[in-house]
């Protein structure tokens, strides 16, 4: 079992990274959050992943995280009934453990629909499972450090700027998952943000799709 991986970042795409170590290149599945954190690094930079090594009858897959806390959060979510590894990774891309706990307590299941391709019954299913397992989230939160995890933008941004940045990132990911190239998605999102003040990522995406 592989539990950690340190090596040279050879390739980075939305959803995965290639890490070369010891003459072998590994493909590591990553969240959009991790992708954004790695994107600012110089090419061929050395990175270190905390790895969740998944093995089943279909094969093996490495899921990579930049902090042990993110890895443990992923394990908590994927352990819920009916929530697989890829869905857990999507949740991790958009919500922290604190945010997910707040959503479950407040009853705002619709907030989960910020995740691309998570609508209706799917968001309700995720909400139900999280709600039924609040104790697991409480235990996770009580055992984690209060120090912030790696964030390349949070140190210099105001709360308003951070909210806008997060809205932008979510909209770009949504467009990428709809088939847009990342560069095109970024350009279209920035165009909408300059010309109007959309309230959420879904509104940004709808405006872009309407203009096509």
UniProtKB/Swiss-Prot annotation:
Keywords: Cytoplasm, DNA damage, DNA recombination, DNA repair, DNA-binding. GO terms for molecular function: ATP binding; four-way junction DNA binding; four-way junction helicase activity. It comes from the Bacteria. Pfam families: RuvA_N. One of its GO terms (biological process) is DNA recombination. CDD domains: UBA_RuvA_C (cd14332). Its main location: cytoplasm. One of its GO terms (cellular component) is Holliday junction helicase complex. Residues 1-66 are annotated as: Domain I. Residues 163-212 are annotated as: Domain III. It is found in: Cytoplasm. Residues 146-162 are annotated as: Flexible linker. Residues 67-145 are annotated as: Domain II. InterPro entries: DNA_helicase_Holl-junc_RuvA_I, NA-bd_OB-fold, RuvA, RuvA_2-like, RuvA_C, RuvA_C_sf. Belongs to the RuvA family. Homotetramer. Forms an RuvA(8)-RuvB(12)-Holliday junction (HJ) complex. HJ DNA is sandwiched between 2 RuvA tetramers; dsDNA enters through RuvA and exits via RuvB. An RuvB hexamer assembles on each DNA strand where it exits the tetramer. Each RuvB hexamer is contacted by two RuvA subunits (via domain III) on 2 adjacent RuvB subunits; this complex drives branch migration. In the full resolvosome a probable DNA-RuvA(4)-RuvB(12)-RuvC(2) complex forms which resolves the HJ. The RuvA-RuvB-RuvC complex processes Holliday junction (HJ) DNA during genetic recombination and DNA repair, while the RuvA-RuvB complex plays an important role in the rescue of blocked DNA replication forks via replication fork reversal (RFR). RuvA specifically binds to HJ cruciform DNA, conferring on it an open structure. The RuvB hexamer acts as an ATP-dependent pump, pulling dsDNA into and through the RuvAB complex. HJ branch migration allows RuvC to scan DNA until it finds its consensus sequence, where it cleaves and resolves the cruciform DNA. HAMAP family: DNA_HJ_migration_RuvA (MF_00031). Has three domains with a flexible linker between the domains II and III and assumes an 'L' shape. Domain III is highly mobile and contacts RuvB. This is Holliday junction branch migration complex subunit RuvA.
